[in-house]
């Protein structure tokens, strides 16, 4: 079976508001097989937003693990992310999962990968997936050169990514927290 390709996830924080968006396209080989996939979830009673790129089943499994860590560490996102990254890197089952995640709360924005990475960006703009570089570039330009709020930056940058990346569409799921 051909590999499923997708997606674009973008996170921006400005003026106390964190916004994460994901597009809805899932591509299998040269065909779009779904237009309305939901790759963004809200965890920890609405205090954490997570988006994933890669295998849907793997991304959902990792979100469940992150939620368990958030419960264990009383909502501390950084501690939970570090512990998940350790497990992801060391556990024989988890190591095979093919997904990358962005997790954010009102104060933190983190990229988590199966390599054990937990990366906080220098600026509060972070993106993953096939259209991630396009979305991040557009978002950084808007963040640095306009007074647009986080949601508007995300909306505009995702539109640009969707115009450039063939694995990204214009059906966005957007979540925000303050």
From Swiss-Prot:
SUPFAM superfamilies: N-terminal nucleophile aminohydrolases (Ntn hydrolases). GO terms for molecular function: metal ion binding; threonine-type endopeptidase activity. It comes from the Bacteria. The active site is at 7. Allosterically activated by HslU binding. It catalyses: ATP-dependent cleavage of peptide bonds with broad specificity. One of its GO terms (biological process) is proteolysis involved in protein catabolic process. It holds the Pfam family Proteasome. It is found in: Cytoplasm. Keywords: Allosteric enzyme, Cytoplasm, Hydrolase, Metal-binding, Protease, Sodium, Threonine protease. Its EC number is 3.4.25.2. Signal peptide: none annotated. It is an enzyme of class 3 (hydrolase). Na(+) binds at residues 162, 165, 168. Belongs to the peptidase T1B family. HslV subfamily. A double ring-shaped homohexamer of HslV is capped on each side by a ring-shaped HslU homohexamer. The assembly of the HslU/HslV complex is dependent on binding of ATP. Protease subunit of a proteasome-like degradation complex believed to be a general protein degrading machinery. HAMAP family: HslV (MF_00248). This is ATP-dependent protease subunit HslV. It comes from Sulfurihydrogenibium sp. (strain YO3AOP1). The lineage of its organism: Bacteria, Pseudomonadati, Aquificota, Aquificia, Aquificales. The gene is hslV.
